[in-house]
Amino acid sequence: LTESTFYILLALASEPLHGYGIIKKVELLSENTIILAAGTLYGALENLKKSHLVDQMLIQDNSRRKVYQITDTGLEVLSHDYLRMKKLCLIAESILKKGEK
């Protein structure tokens, strides 16, 4: 996963959100280091939908907003990528600590 798609999936892991909600949640989670433009977000969401990592929910209130939710497969991929990055960080930490000596 790219950093942006990781944050999009992470934002959706706690609750379904509409596009603007995803943008704001990603900004919050990333401490404003990831600022998604609308075009970038919707392109990423389309790719995530094609990969079956995100679904678009049907809204009954006649709203024009599209709400997205993470799928079970999306949660698995997010968890796997988290563990991959965690392992990478542990390896880097070990190497960098050796370099400090």
Language-model regions: role of each:
Residues N62-Y82:
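Basic, amphipathic "hinge/linker" alpha-helix immediately C-terminal to the N-terminal HTH DNA-binding motif
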Residues I22, L41, G74, M85:
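Conserved anionic group-binding/transfer micro-motifs
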Residues L1-T40:
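N-terminal helix-turn-helix DNA-binding core of bacterial DNA-binding proteins
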